């Protein structure tokens, strides 16, 4: 299959075709500018890590008169205590809470060991900003070794998420042409609205099967299928049937592979804490990791190859070829077929659960805060109407809908933390951080700090509406999509999917709690997920 697909792509490219411009055209873009590094050279003999733990307490905001401190002086949990937190007290599902716990105990910058890994954690808005602003043209992410090892083992290319350096720069420069800016993604409004129409039909069906005629149980599962259908519509330029009564078997197999990927997060973390030479004695985590990736790549390859055949069919009949992202990738010749397989696989993986979890939390918060829901609904009716089907052009007319998404992501950031590897020596929080040190940016902790967001534990979407200098929001306190050149490239797709579906859900339904609605707390499974099923009532608007 793969060989024939490569031959087919070669035939298409030999025809000298280029993407048709009517889908938005190509945007020119040069390489990102390199910020000036904020660094300092290490003194002779300095080490990148020290296994002893310093005393609890917040370090000074800047260097002392005698110069910055070494990592040996940095506070943090002792190695055995840290391992006990994760292995004995289920810390893998509480990573977001452990961020806050360690920040209270050791201050806003602290070190820790997790098996062979040494990490400096940062839970301060200004320090996070310093790290991100000091990044070069190709920032290096942390903890992607297992992804790259799998690709080397199977002879697969890396995608945008797993690539580094010049390879990452090349891929981003290609993909950014079609999905990085709002106006690039706006052309997909029609496709997304078709998926939303199917979602609303599905809600009506599920309601009819409930005793009260209104409750939909486990909206997490419903929004997972919506997100998968929506992302795939853009990536593959085809529908998967996720919202049908009978889901196609190929799609079912992909869902199973995706669920395996996230369900094995804890075992993957166990494996990360154990040296590689021990893997033969505990083979299951790595074996399951590879099996799930095999399923994800298989699914993507089938759909990519189907699109290739469709393009060839059109060419054979003398038709002009045009299309969306995948068609552009084929015809631009900017990526190899293997790189196309890798990128669509990684982007679908990254886009499904991130969108579905955020949408589940949004509906949960609206159900529990009817006064907020009513305010948002009034804005929609006033500015768009009760039944107007919105497009991307309508979203700026409803700023509260955008504020709702920002506030949901502040309270429940999909990624509770982010990783970086320092590319220069940096002085952060009064400590000298050597080049090559792994950093953990604690976004969950900064999102809940009152100095960043007054009354931080409260759900207040209006805080994101700019009103002069009152209640101003500092973006580095909550950056759910990241910052700079390594920020989430699928951000605009996720925002489009969520903004449009929230508007239409509120146009059709009043979202309420039901007798089955329980308090739902967050858990970490790689991503920040609802710790249990979310049940709500979708009541017809009168």
Curated annotation (Swiss-Prot):
Q: Where is the transit peptide?
A: 1-80
Write out the biased-composition intervals (Low complexity): 32-46
Gene Ontology biological-process entries:
retinal metabolic process; retinoic acid metabolic process; retinol metabolic process
Q: What is a single Pfam family found in this protein's UniProt entry?
A: p450
One GO cellular-component annotation of the UniProt record comes to:
intracellular membrane-bounded organelle
Keywords, A to Z, come to: Heme, Iron, Lipid metabolism, Membrane, Metal-binding, Mitochondrion, Monooxygenase, Oxidoreductase, Transit peptide
Asked if the record carries the keyword Kinase, the reply is no
UniProt EC number: 1.14.19.53
For this chain, one GO molecular function annotation is: monooxygenase activity
Q: Does the keyword Heme apply?
A: yes
Q: Which residues participate in heme binding?
A: 488
Which Gene3D superfamilies is this protein grouped with?
Answer: Cytochrome P450
**Coiled-coil region:** none
Judging by the UniProt lineage, the source's domain of life is Eukaryota
Q: Where is this region: Disordered?
A: 20-75
**Tissue expression pattern:** Widely expressed, with highest levels in the liver, kidney and pancreas.
Cofactors per UniProt?
heme
The record's listing under PANTHER family reads: CYTOCHROME P450 (PTHR24279), CYTOCHROME P450 FAMILY 27 SUBFAMILY C MEMBER 1 (PTHR24279:SF122)
The record's comment on protein family reads: Belongs to the cytochrome P450 family.
Q: What is this protein called?
A: Cytochrome P450 27C1
Q: Which gene encodes it?
A: CYP27C1
């Amino acid at each position: 299959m793969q060989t024939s697909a490569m031959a087919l792509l070669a035939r298409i490219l030999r025809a000298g075709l280029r993407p048709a411009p009517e889908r938005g055209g190509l945007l020119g873009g040069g390489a990102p500018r390199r910020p000036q590094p904020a660094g300092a050279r290490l003194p002779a003999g300095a080490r990148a890590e020290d296994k002893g733990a310093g005393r609890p307490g917040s370090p000074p905001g800047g260097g002392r008169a005698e110069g910055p401190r070494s990592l040996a002086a940095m506070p943090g949990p002792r190695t055995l205590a840290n391992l006990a937190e994760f292995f004995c007290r289920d810390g893998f599902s509480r990573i977001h809470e452990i961020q806050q716990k360690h920040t209270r105990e050791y201050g806003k910058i602290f070190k820790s060991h997790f098996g062979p890994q040494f990490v400096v954690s940062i839970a301060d808005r200004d320090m996070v900003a310093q790290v991100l602003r000091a990044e070069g043209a190709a920032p290096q992410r942390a903890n992607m070794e297992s992804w790259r090892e799998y690709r080397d083992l199977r002879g697969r290319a890396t995608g945008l998420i797993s690539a580094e350096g010049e390879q990452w720069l090349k891929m981003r420069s290609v993909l950014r042409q079609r999905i990085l800016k709002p106006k690039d993604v706006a052309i997909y409004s029609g496709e997304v609205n078709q998926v939303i129409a199917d979602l609303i039909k599905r809600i009506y069906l599920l309601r009819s099967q409930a005793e009260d005629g209104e409750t939909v149980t486990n909206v997490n599962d419903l929004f997972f299928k919506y997100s998968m259908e929506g992302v795939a519509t853009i990536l593959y330029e085809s529908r998967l049937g996720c919202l049908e009564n009978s889901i196609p078997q190929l799609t079912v197999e992909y869902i199973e592979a995706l669920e395996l990927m996230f369900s094995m997060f804890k075992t993957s973390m166990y494996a990360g804490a154990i040296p590689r030479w021990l893997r033969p004695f505990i083979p299951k985590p790595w074996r399951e990791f590879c099996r799930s990736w095999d399923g994800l790549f298989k699914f993507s390859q089938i759909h990519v190859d189907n699109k290739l055949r469709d393009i060839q069919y059109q060419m054979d009949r003398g038709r002009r070829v045009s299309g969306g992202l995948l068609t552009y990738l084929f015809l631009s010749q900017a990526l190899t077929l293997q790189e196309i397989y890798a990128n669509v696989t990684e982007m679908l993986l990254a886009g499904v659960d991130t969108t579905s979890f955020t949408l589940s939390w949004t509906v949960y918060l609206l159900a529990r805060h009817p006064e907020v829901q009513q305010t948002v609904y009034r804005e929609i009716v006033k500015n768009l109407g009760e039944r107007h089907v919105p497009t991307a052009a309508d979203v700026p007319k409803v700023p509260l809908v955008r504020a709702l998404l920002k506030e949901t992501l502040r309270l429940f950031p999909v990624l509770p933390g982010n990783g970086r590897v320092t590319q220069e020596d940096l002085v952060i929080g009064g400590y000298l951080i050597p080049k090559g040190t792994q950093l953990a940016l604690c976004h969950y902790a900064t999102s809940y700090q009152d100095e960043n967001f007054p009354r931080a534990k409260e759900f207040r979407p209006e805080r994101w509406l700019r009103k002069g200098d009152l209640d101003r929001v500092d973006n580095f306190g909550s950056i759910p999509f990241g910052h700079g050149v390594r920020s989430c490239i699928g951000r605009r797709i996720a925002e489009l999917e969520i903004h449009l579906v929230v508007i239409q859900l509120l146009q059709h339904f009043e979202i309420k709690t039901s007798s089955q609605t329980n308090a739902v707390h967050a858990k970490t499974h790689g991503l920040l997920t609802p710790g249990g099923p979310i049940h709500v009532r979708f009541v017809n608007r009168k």
